[in-house]
Curated annotation (Swiss-Prot):
InterPro entries: aa-tRNA-synt_IIb, aa-tRNA-synth_II, aa-tRNA-synth_II/BPL/LPL, Anticodon-bd, Anticodon-bd_dom_sf, Beta-grasp_dom_sf, TGS, TGS-like. This is Threonine--tRNA ligase. CDD domains: TGS_ThrRS (cd01667), ThrRS_core (cd00771). Catalyzes the attachment of threonine to tRNA(Thr) in a two-step reaction: L-threonine is first activated by ATP to form Thr-AMP and then transferred to the acceptor end of tRNA(Thr). Also edits incorrectly charged L-seryl-tRNA(Thr). The gene is thrS.
Length: 636
């Protein structure tokens, strides 16, 4: 007999015969939810319900509605789609079919050029396969059998994958009816757990992401635990498409990106206004919270990057140039530069903490296929800062940073923020005592403030734990922006020290921290969060004055001057155009406040006020309208 324990929903234990299946354990220990369980965590490892459990251990259920459960049924759907495509197009060769956020894809090599017109036939075939409700069966094969099987099928992509599996490592396949795929799993017990699915798009993808390899056809899809969940997801995706920051910015003339500078932004005048407002806003917050703003070089000698460790771990993502036979790298991050400023003179413990901030222009050689508007670029500005402090000061610095972070997010209109703590990985440096203290330094401020957080077990960097802060936007999408990362390694590698109270040299802790992440990406998030209708305090044009006729142009110019003197960003449209056309144009440009001026308004020294999103017009004395406007544009 073996003993199985669980902590779900309360700590319990039960005895089972040796080699009991996960399905039997699920039925016995979790009878109320057994029908929705698709897999188990056994001693922290995910496995399917058919796999035997042969020793004492702990289990936790994975339900279909959970994130892990959804990932499993999307994996099922990827296999079902591959089976369907091969049944429709028998010459299909299979490459890879992983899950991704909210979905899955599979890469195919076939003579037929797939298009969205094929989706109906593929989805119908998938539905037929699901209706059979055949089981997913895991088998462990000898390497020779696997090679022979895929050779006979001419599946050269699978053979290439097999060739990279280390000798001695277990090779597993999953059978589904007559369909067999090389796969680690796990899968749900059978196809019926794929309750709702939809194919979404097609793209090209080089095998293994290498442009030297063949271009394959990648079919994307999504799968959910219910038709209602699928419908909700599709609605959100349609809403997200309407909010696409690239389209909105193009319509409004805020920025563009072109092939001659992939991953780099051409900011137009109005977009640059938004950028500078955000930068200045953060600058004021930094000053208030005791940061020193610095500026460091954009390009540094290879030797510094070797010392910092970035050359070894990050070289592929760095842009490297040669000058007088020296290799220089355009900086992908600011931290080594800030250490140079810290160590430019002897520091005393009395100076700590030193909070050093920079709007640092960084560059990373991201793959061209991963670039996406402002969300993933090659050239970007980090709202980056590094706090040099003692171990004893970390807790208070994290507390102060959290207060700053929440002030900023609230001002930008984000109320839902989740926190994750990534703790010590298996491969790490530093003693357990240092890690204990460091993790406590991150947890204690959150506990003191009553902030709930989840733990990403083992996901910290080798040089220290971190907190990640994730925003939820207006349509429920999550965006990880803020970070607090402790670092014991970099100051030591680069020779940073301070003189302690004991008169000896001590290595400071560096806290890497960011609020927005990058300004570019944060602007993209803002555009999509507000669907382009950004708050008046951020709007590049806060007020537009529209004339009904040329007779009131002088009065309109006086109004524009009056608003401009109060630092309102104002534009005057006195063109000889129909007023309805002018209003439609202002609405299209998402101007927060519009003043319409005709003969009547000029005679009474009034304006007719229109707010974006409201079809109503309110007549108001010019002075009162300005006062109301100033209140509106100052609200955060």
């Amino acid at each position: 007999m073996i003993n199985i324990t669980t902590s779900f929903p309360n700590k319990t234990a039960a005895a089972f015969h040796k080699h009991v299946t996960g399905s039997e354990v699920a039925s016995a220990m979790f009878p109320e939810i057994a029908g929705s369980i698709v897999a188990l965590f056994v001693d922290g490892n995910l496995q399917d319900l058919a796999t035997p459990i042969s020793k004492d251990g702990s289990v936790d259920p994975v339900t279909i509605e959970s994130n892990t459960g959804m990932d499993i049924i999307r994996h099922d759907a990827a296999h079902i789609m591959a089976r369907a495509v091969r049944e429709i197009f028998p010459d299909t060769k299979l490459a890879i079919g992983p899950t991704i956020e909210n979905g899955f894809y599979y890469d195919f090599d076939l003579s037929h050029s797939l298009s969205e017109k094929d989706f109906e036939a593929i989805e119908r075939k998938m539905s037929d396969i699901i209706a059979k409700d055949e089981r997913f069966v895991r088998e462990v094969w000898p390497r020779e059998r696997a090679i022979k099987f895929f050779e006979d099928l001419g599946e050269h992509y699978k053979l290439e994958i097999l060739s990279k599996v280390p000798l001695g490592e277990e090779i597993t396949v999953y059978k589904h009816g007559e369909f067999v795929d090389l796969c680690r799993g796990p899968h749900a017990p059978s196809a019926r757990y794929v309750k709702a699915f939809k194919l979404t798009k097609i793209s090209g993808a080089y095998w293994l992401g290498d442009q030297k390899n063949k271009m394959l056809q990648r079919v994307y899809g999504t799968a959910w635990h219910s038709s209602e969940a699928l419908a909700s997801y599709i609605h959100n995706m349609q809403e997200a498409e309407k909010r696409d920051h690239r389209k909105i910015a193009k319509d409004l003339g805020w920025f563009h990106i072109q092939n001659e500078a992939l991953g780099q932004v051409f900011w137009h005048d109005k977009g640059w206004v938004i950028y500078r407002i955000i930068e200045e806003y953060i600058r004021c917050k930094l000053k208030k919270h005791g940061y020193l703003e610095v500026k460091t070089p954009i390009m540094l000698d290879r030797k510094l990057w070797e010392k910092s460790g970035h050359w070894e771990k990050f070289k592929e993502n760095m842009f490297v140039v040669e000058d007088d036979k020296k290799e220089l790298a355009i900086k992908p991050m600011n931290c080594p530069c800030h250490v140079q400023i810290f160590k430019s003179k002897i520091r005393s413990y009395k100076e700590l903490p030193i909070r050093m901030a920079e709007f640092g222009m960084c560059h990373r050689n991201e793959p061209s296929g991963s670039l996406y508007g402002l969300m993933r670029v090659r050239g970007f500005t980090q709202d980056d800062a590094h706090i040099f402090c003692t171990h004893e000061q970390v807790r208070d610095e994290v507390l102060r940073f959290y207060e700053l972070l929440m002030e900023v997010y609230k001002d930008f209109g984000f109320d839902s923020v989740t926190v994750k703590l990534s703790d010590r990985p298996e491969n790490r440096i530093g003693s357990d005592e240092i890690w204990d203290r460091s993790e406590q330094s991150l947890m204690e401020p959150m506990n003191a403030l009553g902030v709930q957080y989840t733990i990403n077990k083992g996901e910290g960097a080798f040089y220290g734990p971190k907190l990640e802060f994730t925003l939820k936007d207006s349509i429920g999408r999550e965006w990880q922006c803020g970070t607090v990362q402790l670092d014991f390694v970099l100051p030591d590698r680069l020779g940073a020290y301070y003189i302690g109270e004991d008169g000896k040299k001590h290595i400071p802790v560096i806290i890497h921290r960011a609020v927005l992440g990058t300004i570019e990406r944060f602007i993209g998030i803002l555009i999509e969060h507000y669907a382009g209708n950004i708050p008046a305090w951020l709007a590049p044009v806060q007020l537009e004055i529209l004339t009904v006729s040329g007779e009131v142009a002088e009065y309109a110019r006086d109004l524009a001057e009056m608003a401009s003197q109060e630092n309102v960003r104002v534009e005057l449209n006195a063109a000889e155009e129909n007023i309805s056309h002018k209003i439609r144009k202002a609405i299209f440009n998402k101007v927060p406040i519009v003043w319409v001026v005709g003969k009547s308004e000029a005679g009474d020294r009034c304006v007719s006020v229109r707010r974006y999103g409201s079809g109503e017009t309110c007549r108001m004395a010019a002075g009162k309208a300005l006062k109301t406007l100033l209140t509106c544009v100052s609200m955060r």
